[in-house]
Swiss-Prot record:
EC number: 2.7.7.6
HAMAP family in alphabetical order: RNApol_arch_Rpo8
Protein name stated in the entry: DNA-directed RNA polymerase subunit Rpo8
Annotated function: DNA-dependent RNA polymerase (RNAP) catalyzes the transcription of DNA into RNA using the four ribonucleoside triphosphates as substrates.
A cellular-component GO term for this protein: cytoplasm
Species of provenance: Saccharolobus shibatae (strain ATCC 51178 / DSM 5389 / JCM 8931 / NBRC 15437 / B12) (Sulfolobus shibatae)
Entry's family note: Belongs to the archaeal Rpo8 RNA polymerase subunit family.
Subcellular location: Cytoplasm
BP GO annotations: DNA-templated transcription
GO molecular function terms noted in the UniProt entry: DNA-directed RNA polymerase activity
Domain of life of the organism encoding this protein: Archaea
Length: 131
């Protein structure tokens, strides 16, 4: 995991792609360093496949991108702490990309605390194929 000037870069592998609850929507599940990330993507723009290696970028600054990347911007909506006995101290951070959701699960520590982010911060989120 790299972090430079509020740009977070995570190396990830796509574990699965499943149908979402809404028509033409899929949910991509990734393992990224110490985090698991799930995000909604519209089927017509899904460029990813299972077991693919990608990088996830989260930044307060606009990121450069190409047609081979999935990028959006939105707001950190909330972070919940799940202290149930099954999960230990698990944190779930939700980002809304104006309707599409990104869910970041940390089993150790608050994602927001680690990266000095706050609820309602405007952020950019990109998933880019490894080149």
């Amino acid at each position: 995991m790299e972090s430079k000037a509020q740009e977070i870069i995570l190396s990830c592998e796509i574990n699965s792609i499943e149908r979402g609850s809404l028509k033409n929507l899929s949910i991509i599940h990734m393992s990224c360093n110490d985090f698991n990330i799930s995000f909604d993507i519209i089927d017509s723009i899904n460029i990813f496949s299972q077991k693919e290696k990608v990088k996830a970028f989260i930044s307060k600054n606009r990121l450069s991108y190409t047609n081979d990347d999935f990028c959006g911007h939105g707001y950190i909506v909330t972070e919940l702490k799940d202290s149930s006995s099954n999960n230990g101290n698990r944190y779930i951070t939700i980002i809304s990309l104006f309707g599409l959701l990104v869910k970041i699960i940390s089993n150790k520590e608050s994602f927001l605390k680690i990266h000095q982010l706050n609820v309602m911060d405007h952020i950019y989120f990109c998933v880019k194929k490894n080149t």
